[in-house]
Structures are given as structure tokens and as C-alpha cells.
Design a protein with these regions (language model features):
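Bacterial N-terminal signal peptides that target proteins for export
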Residues: 1-12
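Tryptophan-paired
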Residues: 48-97
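Post-signal peptide N-terminal segment of mature Sec-exported envelope proteins
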Residues: 30-46
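Bacterial N-terminal signal peptides
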Residues: 11-20
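Compositionally biased low-complexity segments at domain edges in trafficked proteins
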Residues: 114-177
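Beta-strand secondary-structure signal
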Residues: 87-91, 104, 121
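Edge beta-strands of extracellular beta-sandwich domains
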Residues: 100-106
Length: 177
């Protein structure tokens, strides 16, 4: 009887380890932040939708706001342990012209290897999406001021586009009529 109980416990342990290993094969869970504030950082722009990664966590996509209120939120911020996103998808409209744009950024090769306590933040200027990684440490005097004004005292790296002067991205050529 004891041998049977031991075998049963061993089988349960092995199955539990296999299930735990299968669950761990998804994206790394890292304590970091994601957000944007179109009202302040992107005047004249309406965010139509966005999606950071594929976790579906609240604040990582505009889907819930669109379903509940008929439009995407214009500001969001989420902090804490969450899956590290592989991509950032954003669609937006220039309010003055009605022209719509979309862009998908592959974040895998752009993010630093250690994203703990870092913030991913995006803004839009006309037809160009900008993505930043904000390190919450004070910006050294010799570090350039980059990105949204509210982060001017922190170390900010622009990770997209690669360099100034990158051509505009993926116009959907829609206009308000």
C-alpha cells in the first residue's frame, strides 16, 4: 500500500512539474511599466487603438475601452509584474486632417536585456510613432534630453524609430470626409 501511495505521489509530482514547465514557456514576467498620454505628449492626435504584447492585461490594449465606450483610451499606465511584450501596435488619427496611420514595432531586439523597473512609453508626432524606454534613475548631465517633457529628469532612450529622419510609417491613407 505504501509503495502504491509513493508511486501515486511521484506521478503527481512529475505531472505538476510538467504543467509548471509548460506554463513557464510563455513571455518572461518582469516588473516594469507601460503607458502613454496622448493628451499631453501627442497633441492633435487621437489614439484609435493600441496593444502592448499579447497578455491581455488591463491597460495593455485599447480593446476594452473600444468595447465599453466606443473609443480607445487616450492615456494609460500599468506598473508591476507582467509579461514583457514582444510587440507594440498603435493606430492613430491626425485630428486636423483625419488621416489615419498604424505601426507595429517589434520590441524583441530593441528592449534592454534587463527591463526590471523600466518603463515603455510611446508618443506620436504627426505620422511618426516614437517609443521610449525610461530608466527611473536621474539623468546624468551628459545624457541627452529625449522624449516627453515629463521624463526630462530621467534617463530616456528612444528605441523607435532608430534614428532621427526615419520616414513616416504605414499610412492607411484614410481621410475624414
Amino acid at each position: 500500500m505504501k509503495a502504491l501511495l509513493r508511486r501515486l505521489l511521484l506521478v503527481c509530482f512529475v505531472l505538476g512539474a510538467l504543467v509548471a514547465g509548460a506554463c513557464a514557456s510563455g513571455p518572461a514576467v518582469v516588473d516594469h511599466a507601460f503607458g502613454f498620454d496622448a493628451r499631453v505628449d501627442s497633441p492633435g492626435i487621437e489614439i484609435l487603438n493600441f496593444r502592448y504584447g499579447a497578455s491581455g492585461m488591463p491597460g495593455t490594449s485599447g480593446d476594452v475601452g473600444i468595447r465599453q465606450f466606443g473609443r480607445s483610451p487616450q492615456v494609460t499606465g500599468i506598473n508591476g509584474p507582467m509579461p514583457l511584450g514582444d510587440t507594440l501596435y498603435v493606430t492613430w488619427r491626425i485630428k486636423a486632417t483625419g488621416q489615419e496611420f498604424e505601426d507595429t514595432v517589434n520590441l524583441k531586439s530593441r528592449l534592454p536585456s534587463d527591463m526590471a523597473n523600466q518603463r515603455i512609453h510611446f508618443s506620436v508626432k504627426e505620422s511618426q510613432l516614437f517609443v521610449y524606454v525610461i530608466d527611473p534613475v536621474p539623468r546624468p548631465a551628459d545624457w541627452p534630453v529625449v522624449g516627453p517633457r515629463k521624463f526630462q529628469y530621467e534617463k530616456v532612450r528612444q528605441i523607435y524609430p532608430d534614428a532621427p529622419g526615419t520616414p513616416p510609417n504605414h499610412s492607411r491613407n484614410h481621410s475624414a470626409s
